[in-house]
């Protein structure tokens, strides 16, 4: 998920069910919607310069759309990263995860993977990096099958803090298909983080207060 000019953009997954949607989060209205080919499993997205970049999981390809019309503008192939998981941008370049500890840095013009940084704590590497969000100069990343979000220095990959969202799962309706946290979007207008998960029936708005 990602906010762009006040609109919330969402990529959903599963083969045969993947979508790209634009939402008015205040009333849950769908402003635009496109279904992906049944051969694609939709993953992370980011919006830069009025273009939406959407990853697919194992297909080795990213999709490009016009942010206003959802017209398909093209696609790009992955390089050394073999899968598509999470995506964000800092206004100049794109950051991409592939399920490992690597955060790949893509040239915004050519979409080539130019280099990568690795996410590490003082105890070792942090693997299974998934959804990404650019927040005030830091990369927020959740880990696959975890309910926490790591705050990562984009220059050197150092984990500077971890946000624990496990209690949010207790606030959603319990059902057999309920899964873990898997979606977040930072709203720069309100400076709040919107958090949800796979098959959650709620979208939480969270304000992050730095520890003294």
Report residues per predicted region.
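Blade-loop segments of beta-propeller domains
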Residues: 27-64, 70-81
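Beta-rich, blade/repeat-based domains predominating
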Residues: 1-5, 38-48, 79-91, 123-135, ...
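Beta-propeller domains
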Residues: 9-34, 204
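A short beta-strand motif characteristic of beta-propeller blades
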Residues: 29-36, 71-77, 113-124, 161-163, ...
């Amino acid at each position: 998920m990602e906010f762009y000019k006040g609109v919330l953009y969402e990529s959903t997954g599963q083969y045969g069910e993947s979508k790209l949607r634009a939402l008015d989060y205040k009333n849950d209205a769908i402003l635009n919607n496109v279904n992906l080919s049944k051969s694609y499993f939709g993953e992370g997205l980011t919006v830069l310069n009025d273009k939406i970049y959407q990853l697919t999981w194992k297909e080795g390809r990213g999709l490009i759309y016009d942010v206003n019309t959802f017209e398909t503008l093209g696609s790009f192939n992955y390089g050394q990263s073999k899968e598509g998981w999470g995506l964000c941008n800092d206004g100049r370049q794109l950051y991409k995860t592939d399920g490992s500890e690597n955060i790949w840095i893509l040239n915004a013009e050519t979409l080539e993977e130019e280099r990568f940084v690795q996410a590490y704590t003082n105890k070792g590497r942090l693997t299974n990096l998934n959804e990404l969000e650019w927040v005030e100069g830091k990369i927020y990343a959740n880990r696959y099958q975890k309910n926490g979000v790591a705050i990562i220095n984009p220059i050197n990959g150092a984990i500077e803090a971890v946000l624990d969202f496990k209690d949010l799962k207790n606030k959603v309706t319990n059902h057999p298909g309920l899964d873990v946290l898997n979606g977040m979007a930072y709203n720069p207008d309100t400076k709040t983080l919107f958090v949800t998960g796979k098959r959650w029936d709620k979208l939480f708005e969270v304000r992050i207060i730095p520890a003294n």
